[in-house]
Design a protein with these regions (language model features):
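Short glycine/proline-centered loop/turn elements that form peptide/ligand docking sites
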Residues: 9, 16-18, 211-214
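A generic secondary-structure micro-motif detector
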Residues: 9-10, 40-42, 184-185, 208
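C-terminal regulatory/effector modules of DNA-binding transcriptional regulators
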Residues: 143-145, 151-300
């Protein structure tokens, strides 16, 4: 059994610690456990309870109503919300709950439901990436371990790869060529895999190199493949203290090809403008870029 502090519960559910204390005093529906030194903590069952409260309160239920529900009634109400494809926060919490408990079946069923109801692109935008941002906060606060992150990321990667493989390969010699890669020491691959899906779904050719590609290898590949566009996503601070150094190394090893950059490091840094470089803020912008006249006509 894992032990969660009230700060952990706040980080996971979004319910403020002050609010939790007030609810406990007013409604007494959760009684925190105490250590031998009288420090409050919560267990896995309590966490699931608070996640259900978060789901219900974010969807119009008043706490006075929720406090009168039995555990079974609460689960039933959340299940009804989960059946609504327009409720991304419920699905984010379902993924969070199943990650914390390493419940692969629940994680995959939630993922499958969202994709069937909304398609992969909307699922990534509305559910997966908000979920991953939440995982990031939980990792920073020590609520989850690397094992939790690897568990959820691997399941999402498997689904992405399966969906990408199901798309038809492009044999049109006039189609644009995209080179997708992550630079040396960058291993966060979900954004790049989603870019792979978008590019392939629009009927373009893709050479996908994946994570942590040495800079000097880009020189060889870009000469041999002659891509129209090169795409990378920068996420980890481990790759370099200065994101502009990373971009400079990438550009030095390309041969004038257009570079598309995105990712958390790009958004949080002062990136210097460069010739033939496009900075994209989010997934919606990326989808619009791939379908735009810039790509379709290649400046013709």
């Amino acid at each position: 059994m894992r032990k969660f502090s009230i700060s952990d519960i706040e980080a996971i559910t979004g319910i403020k610690a002050h609010t939790i204390r007030i609810w406990e005093q007013r409604y007494a529906f959760v009684v925190p456990k105490r250590t031998e030194t009288n420090i409050r903590y919560y267990d896995d069952k309590d966490l699931c309870f608070f996640l259900n409260i978060s789901n219900l309160s974010e969807n119009g239920y008043k706490i006075s109503e929720i406090s009168k529900m039995s555990a079974e009634e609460m689960v039933s109400a959340v299940s009804l919300l989960s059946a609504d494809s327009c409720n991304p926060c419920v699905h984010v919490n379902a993924l969070t709950d199943s990650t914390l408990l390493f419940n692969e079946a629940k994680f995959l069923s939630t993922l499958a439901f969202c994709i069937e109801a909304k398609g992969l692109e909307k699922t990534m935008q509305e559910t997966i990436f908000p979920f991953m941002r939440k995982m990031g906060v939980m990792w920073q606060t020590g609520v989850i371990t690397p094992a939790h992150e690897h568990f959820s990321t691997d399941l999402i990667k498997r689904k992405l790869i399966c969906t990408i493989d199901a798309l038809p390969n492009c044999d049109d010699f006039q189609a644009k060529r995209f080179l997708l890669f992550l630079p040396s020491l960058e291993t966060h691959e979900l954004g790049l895999l989603f870019a792979h899906y978008i590019v392939k779904s629009y009927g373009h050719q893709v050479l996908y190199l994946g994570q942590s590609i040495p800079y000097e290898d880009l020189d060889v590949v870009s000469q041999a493949y002659q891509p129209d566009f090169c795409i990378t996503c920068l996420t980890s601070v481990l790759i370099d203290n200065d994101v502009n150094n990373v971009i400079d190394k990438i550009v030095e090893n390309l041969h004038g090809q257009k570079l598309v950059v995105s990712g958390p490091l790009i958004l949080s840094s002062n990136v210097h403008p460069r010739k033939n470089m496009f900075i994209l803020k989010n997934l919606i912008e990326f989808s619009e870029f791939v379908s735009s006249r810039i790509v379709a006509h290649e400046y013709k």
